[in-house]
Amino acid sequence: MYELKTLLPQFDIKLPTCMYPLKNVSLAADSLASGSSTSASTSASTSSCKLEANRIDRTGRNAATCALDLDSLGRQIQRLLKDDTASVAARQEKVLKQLEELKAQLGQIRAGLGVCGKTFQHTTAFQNGGLKEVPLQDVVINGHPNFIPYALLALKNAWRNLYTIDVKTFTHSTMADIGPAAREFEANLAKVPVNPALPKISVTLIWKNCEHTEMISSPTMYVPIYGEVNIIRYLGRVGPAEYRYEGSPLCNEIDLVLDICYQLLRCNTHKTQVAMVRLLDKRLQKQQYFGGSQMSVADVGVYSSLIRMPAVTEKDLTPALVAWRKRAKLVVQI
């Protein structure tokens, strides 16, 4: 016959060193079995194989069968398992001791740093669904005196007991005079006190000869947020929880109202302005506020937009919008 190649050639297997080795149970059992068989040949009482001669045919031939000694094999397995169990238990005790020492060291470090020893602390990140809250960076808003961001004053008054917006104003070299309306706006901002006990965001308002109101929220890269409406959205997301509307069922409705405000501020004719006001009236319907029964950032956006549109008088407003404006004025105080 022709010779076949070996399917599993003999080669050295490199065993990993990251884990401790275990004894080979089968090899150990074979070695014990071979040792016991050699010793059993000297004694008939401890023999592992018993020969039974039975005459099974007429020719007188004898058949020999080997009976396995299960008791001896069971004792060998128990002895092997006992040795391995003892070594595993010793290693486990060593690991537990090391963990106790590590726990004691961490306790000393925690005590030295003055960290609370509670195993679990409910933080604000746990309460808002896992969002990580970090200290807010100071923001800078560039605005033209002809397009005063009244939303800053409205939010500052509305959040008087919830959140502090610390606004400081400066004048850019491109502006010779900011005008009486901007100066009155600065005076009204200064009248609202800053409560140091409340969370705060610092806003630097720079009167500048710019086309759009823009906000820079990052001190490292110039990524502006254009438009007063989008600035309201940003402040609504970082402001008090009462005015955060992402988790509200009226989230889409509030965003839609703010979009209408954005279009209203860009209307060039009185006819288009009145058309946008009619859309706002449809969104308000019979509600007290655009966000339902409570004041929201949508109301702040609408109120500020109407102030910036002097051509839209009270005659252009529906009775529902007139009643809403009176209620909102009590909150924003403008």
From Swiss-Prot:
Residues 280-327 form the GST C-terminal domain. Keywords: Cytoplasm, Nucleus, Protein biosynthesis. Gene3D superfamilies: 1.20.1050.130. It is found in: Cytoplasm, Cytosol; Nucleus. GO terms for cellular component: aminoacyl-tRNA synthetase multienzyme complex; cytosol; nucleus. Its main location: cytoplasm. Component of the aminoacyl-tRNA synthase complex which is comprised of a bifunctional glutamyl-prolyl-tRNA synthase, the monospecific isoleucyl, leucyl, glutaminyl, methionyl, lysyl, arginyl and aspartyl-tRNA synthases, and three auxiliary proteins. Required for assembly and stability of the aminoacyl-tRNA synthase complex. This is Probable aminoacyl tRNA synthase complex-interacting multifunctional protein 2. The lineage of its organism: Eukaryota, Metazoa, Ecdysozoa, Arthropoda, Hexapoda. The gene is AIMP2.
